[in-house]
Amino acid sequence: MNLRPVIVGGGSAGMAAAIELARRGVPCVLFDEASRPGGVVYRGPLRAGVDPAYLGARYTRMLEKLRRDFSACAGHIDLRLNSRVVGGDGQRLMVLDEAERLHEVEYSHLLLATGCHERSVPFPGWTLPGVMLLGGLQLQIKSGVVKPLGDTLIAGSGPLLPLVACQLHAAGVRVAGVYEACAFGRMARESLALLNKPQLFLDGLSMLGYLKLNGIPLHYGWGVVEASGDGELTEVTVAPYDEEWRPDLENARPVKASTLAVGYGFIPRTQLSQQLGLEHGFSDDGYLRAECNVWQQSSQPHIHLAGDMAGIRGGEAAMIGGRIAALSILLQREAIAPAEAIERRESHLARLEAIKRFRAGVERYTQRGARQVELARADTVICRCEQVTRGDIERALEQGVQDIAGLKMRTRAGMGDCQGRMCIGYCSDRLRRATGRHDVGWLRPRFPIDPIPFSAFQNLGTEA
């Protein structure tokens, strides 16, 4: 049986890998959950007639080039959109297709480019309508779906804050202010590291200039204390943060807003890599990530990782990782000479090193303060699926819980349909702070990774 490589995830990494394979005449299957490829970075507007000019000329050029390259290789890429991989093992995947039919799909090689999800940071009022995660709001703007009405406030930490503020304003949204939790001096200390990517550094300065020119205030060392409103968001309380992100409540002030977008970084989606039994480790920030080598190979050599699965470093790094993974697959299939594969890999790795140095600087200045876990009050819901509060978690800690598995058993946190995607970040942070240990475990995924209808089992079969 002549099996094909399978790529899970049609974002930057998955598309780059598929293009690389296709250019060598190797056909592949590419699965993506969305209705068009591109991922969060390059999906573009979902509706016809939407002009993405507000996202910037350089972004538009990169989007158009990626689409042209992908279209040119379409004859070798079996693109399966609106399809979810809900489980798998070392030889096959379980896929729910667009018609909600379940299939087993076997593969010769597998590339996991499943991306990431946003880190949720609970605080009083974070479940109010009008409060949303920053990446989700940006995706709505990029997709041309909907724009928030009224005043929008942006809070959190990282380079995504000013970027989204500029994109929102350019799209016609009223941005009331941007609140960056880290102090300006902390960011300035990383200037040399940030200069490893001069264009991105200049883009950052340009965004700051845009905000100033358009009268959008940017507050360093400030963050959210509480969101409030009767049934929906009407007001956000912000305050100065100290180095540990402890809010100075004496100097807190209310800000009127109908939308609050909060962004505190991302966590790789490791549900499938865990089901496949790959080796994992923990990042400095405490999240679980699958391990890979310089060929993007996991602990199982025919399974590769790219994009956020291999480290959260942005779209450019994701594409480089996808290309390296494709070179490894081509090498294993004897579709490329070893010397050429190594030469091209080294060229890609040289570019990747500069990105890694840049990202290391970003990670240092955006490192979350230890007191962030104390923003939530005793009655603040942490696990939205099971309505587990911070008080429930604190009682479990008092009773001697030492790891994620114990916390899940004691409180039901992480037992809902999202399988902990919303609460795992907080639970891990709180356990690490309480126990003083870096490794407190992680939530083990169940099959299926996503909910599926019973009707999906009617036509279950195996597809090569």
Curated annotation (Swiss-Prot):
Checking InterPro entries in the record gives: BFD-like_2Fe2S-bd_dom, BFD-like_2Fe2S-bd_dom_sf, FAD/NAD-bd_sf, FAD/NAD-binding_dom, Metab_Enz_Cyan_OpOx_G3PDH, Opine_Oxase_asu/HCN_bsu
Q: Which GO terms describe its molecular function?
A: glycine dehydrogenase (cyanide-forming) activity
Enzyme Commission designation: 1.4.99.5
Effect of pH on activity? Optimum pH is 8.3 (in the presence of Tris-HCl). Active from 7.3-7.8 in the presence of other buffers.
Q: How does activity depend on temperature?
A: Not stable at 0 degrees Celsius. Decrease in activity up to 40% immediately after freeze-drying procedure, with a further decrease up to 10% when stored at -10 degrees Celsius.
Physiological role? A three-component membrane-bound flavoenzyme that catalyzes the formation of hydrogen cyanide, a secondary metabolite, by transfer of electrons to a cyanide-resistant branch of the aerobic respiratory chain.
Q: What does the subunit comment say?
A: Heterotrimer of HcnA, HcnB and HcnC.
Q: What is this protein called?
A: Hydrogen cyanide synthase subunit HcnB
Q: Which organism is it from?
A: Pseudomonas aeruginosa (strain ATCC 15692 / DSM 22644 / CIP 104116 / JCM 14847 / LMG 12228 / 1C / PRS 101 / PAO1)
The gene that this protein is the product of is: hcnB
